[in-house]
């Protein structure tokens, strides 16, 4: 049921997941380092565009993501036009025994229909200010499509690189003329090797 007769995914959620984390062919000359990388959807279409938009949301949250019908401006939560819709808080707590500053952005009561990012919590290592983990809660109903997604990302150090260690996704979405898709997964990434 996951694949059609030609080996393609029947589900868009599975196709996006596979496109983000797996490759069908060997990949040469790519370092996969996102630090300093400028994400852009320019010249992209279809699934490639949507994969890049997801990368933008994962690695550069709070920025405007072009090309998302009705919600592009609603992802830029730190812009003046959106910031008044949120309560922002800084706290200090341990995360997996690491002392962290915890930055939480949560939608204000009554503003839920004006936003896409309902809540985002980021744990920063108190000594290095590197991201230790981030949780996202997203939802929107545009009439012809809707979604509700919760994601968790845990980071780890591999040498001098900060890389995702655990990714959790629990969500559902519906687009006009398509069946509702629900997905729950946990991706545990390991055995990182740096070449070159």
Label every PLM stretch briefly.
Residues 1-116, 140, 181-196:
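Structured extracytoplasmic
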Residues 92-98, 112, 118, 127-195:
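Acidic, serine/threonine-rich low-complexity disordered tracts
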Residues 122-124:
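Non-globular disordered terminal and juxtamembrane segments underlying protein topogenesis/assembly
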């Amino acid at each position: 049921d996951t694949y059609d007769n030609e080996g393609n995914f029947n589900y868009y959620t599975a196709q996006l997941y596979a496109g983000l984390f797996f490759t069908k062919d060997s990949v040469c000359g790519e370092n996969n380092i996102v630090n300093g990388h400028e994400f852009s959807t320019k010249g992209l279409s279809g699934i490639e565009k949507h994969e890049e938009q997801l990368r933008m949301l994962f690695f550069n949250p709070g920025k405007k993501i072009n090309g998302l019908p009705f919600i592009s401006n609603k992802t830029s939560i730190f812009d003046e036009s959106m910031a008044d819709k949120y309560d922002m808080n800084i706290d200090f707590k341990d995360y997996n025994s690491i002392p962290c500053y915890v930055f939480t952005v949560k939608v204000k009561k009554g503003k839920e229909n004006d936003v896409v990012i309902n809540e985002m919590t980021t744990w920063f290592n108190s000594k290095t200010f590197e991201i230790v983990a981030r949780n996202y809660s997203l939802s929107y109903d545009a009439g012809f499509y809707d979604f509700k997604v919760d994601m968790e990302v845990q980071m780890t150090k591999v040498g001098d690189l900060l890389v995702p260690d655990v990714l959790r996704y629990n969500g559902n979405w519906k687009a006009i003329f398509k069946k509702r898709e629900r997905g729950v997964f946990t991706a545990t990434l390991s055995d990182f090797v740096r070449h070159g």
